[in-house]
Amino acid sequence: MDIIQAIVLGIIQGLTEFLPISSSAHLRIFPALLGWDDPGAAFTAIIQIGTLAAVLIYFYQDILRITSATISGLVNRNPFGSQDSRMGWMISAGTIPIVVLGLLFKKNIETTFRSLYIISGSLILLALVLMYAEYLVKKREARGEKMLSLDKVDWKEAIIIGLAQSLALIPGSSRSGTTITGGLFLGMTRETAARFSFLLSLPAVFAAGVYQLLKVWPELMASGDELVNLTVATVVSGVIGYASIAFLLDYLKKHSTYLFIIYRILLGVFLLAMLSMGKLEAF
């Protein structure tokens, strides 16, 4: 990998991490289309630290408030005494499924699941599920139903959305896509589902990124160029990711997710066509 590839991959990660179109899929697809080597699951996990930083900066007030309230609740032996402390526990509960399943299927995530056939299928399948979730949202809006707000998220919702997040272990599913879809099924507005999705991403993305970084650290120390490339890609992904968060939250205030649904289906079909014609290899 050279510096130009690192910058391009950083831009792709930043653009696609928060949009429901799967960053891991795009980091697998674009190198294949451009004739580059697959950057691998470790590279994908590490540069997500950049987009993690974007979430920390964008939501720093919410994060400080939630963290402070959660710690205060523990110290005062009243862990659910405030809405912010409850949110801290809901985020923790929602993180459990992806941690457990990530450890159980670690080998598959790094190998089998990176097949372009699996990625194309995931892109299309999640698009169809998200389309149905949008249909349910339209029906609720037509009936004038009250939507689920963040302060009403309880254990059930946190675990269900956490299970949805664990589907993102399969490239092509999209972490934001699965969690936003889960939120829509539970009756959240699009913007509320996206906000909870971003907050829920913090523990899992941090853990995966640090784990992979420690795992490859000796190799990075032995290769200065690789360390520079990884650092550049991570920084670029953070800068672009911040803008991507702002865009999506504003976009979902006024629009549905149909734009992303159409894109996912078209990309999935394109991939299948390229694979069937022998223009791309599955691995």
From Swiss-Prot:
Catalysed conversion reaction: di-trans,octa-cis-undecaprenyl diphosphate + H2O = di-trans,octa-cis-undecaprenyl phosphate + phosphate + H(+)
Compartmental location: Cell inner membrane
UniProt KW keywords: Antibiotic resistance, Cell inner membrane, Cell membrane, Cell shape, Cell wall biogenesis/degradation, Hydrolase, Membrane, Peptidoglycan synthesis, Transmembrane, Transmembrane helix
GO biological process assignments: cell wall organization; peptidoglycan biosynthetic process; regulation of cell shape; response to antibiotic
Molecular function GO terms recorded: undecaprenyl-diphosphatase activity
PANTHER family the UniProt entry points to: UNDECAPRENYL-DIPHOSPHATASE
A Pfam cross-reference name: BacA
E.C. number(s) listed in UniProt: 3.6.1.27
Stated name of the protein: Undecaprenyl-diphosphatase
Membrane spanning stretches: 1-21, 40-60, 85-105, 117-137, 196-216, 232-252, 258-278
Gene designation: uppP
Extra remark beyond the main annotation: Bacitracin is thought to be involved in the inhibition of peptidoglycan synthesis by sequestering undecaprenyl diphosphate, thereby reducing the pool of lipid carrier available.
Cleavable signal peptide: none
Organism: Chloroherpeton thalassium (strain ATCC 35110 / GB-78)
